């Protein structure tokens, strides 16, 4: 019984190690490169006192699917933020309709 549990634990550790290495070696670099390519291709330069915002794609219509989201990289006085503007009902219920749908993360 002890040997069975030991080998089962070793196999679980190997599976988790493989999956986590796949995420960090394959998926994460691809996601970061695509984010930076999008950010660098459409970043507009302005002075430090104002806001540098990426030129955003076409505005989502109200008929957009609930999982539609718009990711933009903005720079406020030298600090980079990733803003995710989402058209979901979750944000509307959480923040209310009067609040801008979206959130920013300092990077």
Swiss-Prot record:
Membrane-crossing segments per the record: 13-33
Topology of the protein relative to the lipid bilayer: Single-pass membrane protein
Keyword terms, alphabetized: Membrane, Transmembrane, Transmembrane helix
Superkingdom of the organism of origin: Eukaryota
Localization in the cell: Membrane
GO cellular component, one term: membrane
Main localization (coarse): membrane
Note: Partially overlaps DAL81.
Protein's name in the database: Putative uncharacterized membrane protein YIR023C-A
Organism: Saccharomyces cerevisiae (strain ATCC 204508 / S288c)
């Amino acid at each position: 019984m002890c040997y069975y549990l030991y080998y089962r634990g070793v196999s679980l550790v190997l599976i988790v190690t493989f999956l986590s290495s796949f995420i960090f070696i394959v998926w994460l670099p691809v996601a970061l490169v695509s984010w930076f390519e999008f950010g660098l291709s459409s970043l507009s330069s302005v002075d430090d006192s104002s806001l540098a915002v990426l030129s955003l794609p076409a505005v989502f219509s109200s008929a957009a699917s609930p999982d539609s989201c718009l990711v933009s990289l903005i720079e406020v006085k030298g600090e980079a933020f990733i803003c995710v503007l989402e058209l979901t009902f979750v944000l509307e219920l959480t923040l209310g309709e009067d609040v801008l749908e979206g959130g920013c993360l300092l990077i």
